[in-house]
């Protein structure tokens, strides 16, 4: 059974406790691979809240941050968000960069990538293929 998380005053279906002010977004500030490289290697890389560029074996790896939204069952519809990193190829990164500030970027065709963040589930999540749907400027892409 999966616990039902709710920030309302209704008791949890699993533990019967009332959970208030629960975090609705969890995630990492960098891709797992960024966290695995040395400080020296990080000097050659770039990390912003939305993009990571990481030199790797004579090439470059490209990552963007996106959101996986999961519905939360409760008295009021809510959403829990995993803020994760996705590795994209150079062509996809160029397409993302071209439209990043475009007010109509949500109309951009979906792209593909691979999950670059491990999530705490029984089965491994790193490397899973995802479809990236860009949204309006200021909003992380939906995966």
Labelled PLM ranges:
Residues 1-77:
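Basic, glycine-/proline-tolerant helical and adjacent loop/strand elements
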Residues 31, 79-82, 97:
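Intrinsically disordered regions, especially transient/low-confidence alpha-helical propensity segments
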């Amino acid at each position: 059974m999966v616990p039902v998380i709710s920030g309302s005053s209704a008791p949890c279906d699993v533990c019967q406790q009332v959970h208030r002010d629960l975090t609705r977004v969890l995630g990492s500030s960098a891709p797992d691979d960024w966290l695995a490289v040395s400080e020296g290697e990080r000097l050659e890389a770039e990390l912003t809240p939305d993009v990571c560029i990481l030199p790797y074996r004579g090439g470059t790896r490209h990552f963007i941050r996106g959101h996986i939204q999961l519905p939360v069952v409760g008295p009021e519809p809510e959403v829990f968000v995993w803020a994760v990193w996705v590795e994209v190829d150079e062509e996809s990164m160029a397409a993302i960069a071209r439209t990043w500030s475009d007010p109509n970027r949500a109309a951009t065709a979906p792209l593909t990538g691979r999950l670059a963040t491990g999530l705490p589930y029984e089965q491994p999540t790193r490397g899973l293929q995802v479809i990236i749907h860009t949204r309006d400027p200021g909003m992380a892409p939906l995966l």
